[in-house]
Each structure stands twice: as C-alpha cells, then as structure tokens.
Amino acid sequence: MPYGDNDWLALTQEPTIEPDLPICDPHHHFWDFRDVRIPYQRYLLDELNADVYSGHNIRSTVFIETRSMYKPDGPDDLKSVGEIEFVQGLAAASASGVYGPTRAAAAIIGNGNLNLGEKVQPVLESLKLASPNRFQGIRQPCGWDPNPEVETRAPEQQLANSNFRKGAQILANMGLSLDITVYFHQLEELADFAKSVPDVTIILNHIGGLYRIGPYANRDNEVLPHWREGIKKVSECDNIVLKLGGIGQPRYGFLWHTYSKPISSENLSNELAPLINYCIDQFTPARCMFESNFPPDKVSYSYNILFNAFKILSKQYSDKERSDLFHDTATRIYKIAT
C-alpha cells in the first residue's frame, strides 16, 4: 500500500455506528513536519476536522505534545512554549464554531522536562501563561529499551531519578497532570514511580507500550504475559488512568498498514478486544478512555473505522461505563467543561 495514504483508507467505507454517542478524543497531535519523511507530514486543523467530522459525534479533543513548532531561539527549556502558542491559536479557531461544533484542543498537553527538578516550575508557568484556559499538563516520554533498534527517548531508570520525582511533585502542586509513554517492560517501574508521587494524576498512553516487532517479534509467549502483569501492577495505583489506543502503530505488531485494503471495523474490533478488554478489566471503565492517536494510527485505519471498532467491542458494557470510556473519563481527567 502507499504507506499513510488517504486514497488507501478510502478503500474501506462503512456507515458510522451510533453516530450520536458523545465522544471526547483524548489523544491526537497537530504538526507540520514537511521536511521529515513520515506519513501524514501535515496534520493541522483542516486535517483533524476531516477526521472528526467523518461521522462520529466528537464533542471535544485533547492535543498531546509532539515537539512541533518549537521556538527557534531562547533558552532550550522554554522552546516548547512555542508549541503551546501554536496550538492555542488552532484551538481558538476551532472554538469560534466556524468549522463546526467540535472543540478541538479543548485541553492542551505540552512538554516540560521534569528532570529539572524544582527548576521546572518556571517552565510550567510559562506553558500555562501561553494557554491559561486550556493547558492542563505535560507529557514526558520515558521509553527506554536496551536494544539499539528500539527508539529510546529517555535515560534508563528515569522514573526513579530523584530530580524527575521532584519535578513531578511540582506538577502536582500546580494541579497539572502527567501523560507518560513507556515500554511494556517498564510498567513495574511506572508503578513504583506512581506510588512515590500519589498526588500526580498520571495518564498512561497507548495501553502501556506494547512492542511486538524487531527484537520482540515472534515472542508473544514472553511479551504478552509480561505486559499483562505490568498492566495489573499499574492498575493498582489509583493515580494512574489508561488510554486505550495507539495500537495501529506498526510497532504493536499487527501489520494492518500492509494490507491491500484497510481492515474493517468488525475485524479490527476482534483483534483489539483481547488487549483492550483486559485493560478495562484491570482499570475499570472509570479509569480508561478510548483514544485515536491520530495521525500516527492513521497509517492503519480511518477515524470512522477506529471508533466503529471501539463501539463494537464496548457493547458488553453498560451505558454509564460506555460514557466513561468514550467521553466522561477524558473530560474529567483533562478538566474539560461539558
């Protein structure tokens, strides 16, 4: 297939299931990486609108940092303020109602370096100043892996670092949340970290960082039990909530992006269900939220297909539980007015 191509996605068309069900999408990005060879180099308000208005009732969304539109000069620790300024403008345009009723980036999650310890406070204050009404926290990548072919974006044992924990406490003192990415074999470390900073609301991204390609290919008999045990451990920490998504990224090992025609929502639901239902069983719906992770996940399926799949696999839950999964957990955690 043409990797990351709207024409390919259009080969699988379906009517939207339950089009009136309210949804808050708690995880997407905005970027313009025109100089980088990646799928969907440009994903701004027009591109997001094409997805969120493709059939489902997306009431609001949450922008998650992606190191885009940083300031070109000034102190390194403050360059990420540029991303917040950029997204604040897109959010204001969306809130005008000109494009439709969805409030894009109703909450904004930026980037700040907790390894600064207590010195992170002025950075967080600058981020908040750039978006007084929408900035709700930061995301800090903590993924580390010993294999050189696996992308590592943090030092080993960063979650145990005393400065990192001091920085997290500053975050808590300011009433801000912490989105975190890790790999599946780091989940026990995350549980230990969460217990050390019980006042911090931690949002674990992408079902806890499963990895099933490269050095972890053909090792499901080891990887999946390790992941399940890790999910169980982090679920025991009351200050951690979980995002259900990100599974369309190729590193999750499903290879849907290689199909001659995109997967249907029924088949996608069947393949997602064992992982997602396990997560919900451990965390409960009140601590879980369905996410799109667009555009990274867009290499595997369309927005309409993904949320159709989420609706199919969640039919076993009560109306209240489904409201939590699709909308209420996200708006509560990210403090979005409804």
Report the location of each language-model feature.
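Short amphipathic alpha-helices and their capping/turn segments at secondary-structure boundaries
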Residues: 9-19, 44-55, 119-134, 188-198, ...
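Mid-to-C-terminal alpha-helical segments outside catalytic/metal-binding sites
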Residues: 1-22, 36-60, 277-278, 282-289, ...
